[in-house]
Amino acid sequence: MAASLQSANPTLSRTLASPNKPSSFATFRSPFLRFNSTSVASNFKPLVSREASSSFVTRSAAEPQERKTFHGLCYVVGDNIDTDQIIPAEFLTLVPSNPEEYEKLGSYALVGLPASYKERFVQPGEMKTKYSIIIGGENFGCGSSREHAPVCLGAAGAKAVVAQSYARIFFRNSVATGEVYPLDSEVRVCDECTTGDVATVELREGDSILINHTTGKEYKLKPIGDAGPVIDAGGIFAYARKAGMIPSAAA
């Protein structure tokens, strides 16, 4: 099943690793699955298939994609923010599928940043951040592979990361867990924004943008493509269940 998903859709082939046995994909239950399964959008649409396939429903070219908007404060970081800075290894024992540990995981998001970052992403003693949009430079999410990295950002309350480029494993984990939108900017937005700026991210096929209301500047973002519906659904397993690609948890 996983192999057919990958061959049918190039984006999924970058976000889903095939298991050794076909049956293991259907029975595997990741600790990184969101516990609030009701978060799957009611207007969920399967990925657009470039070729005829019974596994996908082709969306009409005339049918507009729903615009998704995130509005809030920005938290700005630089280049090469690695996963140790996003969530230090000492907190990897927390299990995101446990609601209490999921919330606690969010309180440690970006706690590994150096002291040069005077403003904490999550204030000491708080469980959530006041920053809903993270703006970074090149190679965001580099370092060791850990699903906790995008999960902790989503648990803290972040909705999107806008960076000049990503480490591929962080991008894949962001899509697979469905926690945050990893969006690519066409210019170095991190050099023109400041932590605390008020911004809006608008996602729509072909014309995604970031608007910095504090400076009045607007930046074009690269389309996230077919990865968008997977994140909307809450991750790759929630997406596959919703699309009927694997049995639902209740089956």
Swiss-Prot record:
What Enzyme Commission number(s) apply to this enzyme? 4.2.1.33
State the Gene Ontology BP annotations: chloroplast organization; gametophyte development; glucosinolate biosynthetic process; L-leucine biosynthetic process
Q: Which domain of life is it from?
A: Eukaryota
Tissue specificity as recorded in UniProt:
Expressed at low levels in roots, root tips, at the basis of the hypocotyls, and in emerging leaves. In young seedlings, expressed in cotyledon epidermal cells. In hypocotyls, expressed in peripheral cells. In seedling roots, expressed in the epidermis, including root hairs, and throughout the cortex. In rosette leaves, expressed in the upper and lower epidermis. In roots of adult plants, expressed in the root tips and cortex of the mature root enclosing the stele. In flowering stalks, expressed in the epidermis. Expressed in the carpel epidermis.
FT transit peptide: 1-59
The record's note on what follows loss of this gene reads:
Embryonic lethality when homozygous.
Subcellular location(s): the record lists: Plastid, Chloroplast stroma; Plastid
Q: Which GO terms describe its cellular component?
A: chloroplast; chloroplast stroma; plastid
Q: Which UniProt keywords apply?
A: Amino-acid biosynthesis, Branched-chain amino acid biosynthesis, Chloroplast, Leucine biosynthesis, Lyase, Plastid, Transit peptide
| Molecular function GO labels | 3-isopropylmalate dehydratase activity
Which pathway does the UniProt entry assign to this protein?
A: Amino-acid biosynthesis; L-leucine biosynthesis; L-leucine from 3-methyl-2-oxobutanoate: step 2/4
User: So what does this thing catalyse?
Assistant: (2R,3S)-3-isopropylmalate = (2S)-2-isopropylmalate
Function of this protein? Catalyzes the isomerization between 2-isopropylmalate and 3-isopropylmalate, via the formation of 2-isopropylmaleate. Plays an essential role in leucine biosynthesis. Functions in both the biosynthesis of leucine, and in the methionine chain elongation pathway of aliphatic glucosinolate formation. Plays an essential role in female gametophyte development.
Report the sequence similarity comment from the record: Belongs to the LeuD family.
Spell out the note in the miscellaneous section: Plants silencing SSU1 exhibit stunted growth, narrow pale leaf blades with green vasculature, abnormal leaf adaxial-abaxial patterning, and abnormal flower morphology.
Q: How does it assemble?
A: Heterodimer of the large LEUC/IIL1 subunit and the small LEUD (SSU1, SSU2 or SSU3) subunits.
Name this polypeptide is given: 3-isopropylmalate dehydratase small subunit 1
